[in-house]
Amino acid sequence: MMYIVFIMSVLYVVGFIGFSSKPSPVYGGMSLVVSGGLGCGIIMSSGGSFLGLVVFLVYLGGMMVVFGYTIAMATEEYPETWGSNVVVLSAFLVGLLMEVFMVVWLFSGEHELVGFYFGGLESFVTLGEGGFEYVREDYSGGASLYSCGFWFLAMAGWMLFVSIFIATEITRKRY
């Protein structure tokens, strides 16, 4: 089961690398939908079946509508693929190579990454001793997001705040 989750998480990141180097809206939307589905699979394999189902229905359902309209508006007769442009293909391959090196480096025994120390998280237990569950994994994951994952939550909020200004700047009409 752990290998399946690992493969899904690697494909999850590969999908987002494909989205970030998208040459056409068709392939970018496809990459985002595949990555969203894999993320829901990771959540469901971790024990959060209800959360995975809700994210799958709401997030991917909304994305299908948005990307359906986007693709209909930006239909190209000959859409550009990842291999048709050398720069886009090289950006995709460099991102993929960086991910492979990161995974190899993390599994090599070196546990420190850019100031974040991953050791000591062995004591972070979501289940009780002997298989007796104190709290469901859905609830303990939400609690750990606000306690141990505070910096991740703050960074995600900051990125959403900055994305408002980016979207406003892109869509602003210049006369």
UniProtKB/Swiss-Prot annotation:
What is the main EC category here?
A: translocase
TM segment ranges: 1-21, 24-44, 51-71, 87-107, 112-132, 148-168
Q: Give the Gene Ontology MF terms in alphabetical order.
A: NADH dehydrogenase (ubiquinone) activity
Record's bilayer topology term = Multi-pass membrane protein
Task: List GO terms (cellular component aspect).
Answer: mitochondrial inner membrane
Catalysed reaction per UniProt?
A: a ubiquinone + NADH + 5 H(+)(in) = a ubiquinol + NAD(+) + 4 H(+)(out)
InterPro entries, A to Z: ComplexI_Subunit6, NADH_UbQ/plastoQ_OxRdtase_su6, Nuo/plastoQ_OxRdtase_6_NuoJ
Please report which protein family the annotation says this sequence is part of.
Belongs to the complex I subunit 6 family.
Under which name does UniProt file this protein? NADH-ubiquinone oxidoreductase chain 6
Q: Which organism is it from?
A: Elephas maximus
- UniProt lists the gene as MT-ND6
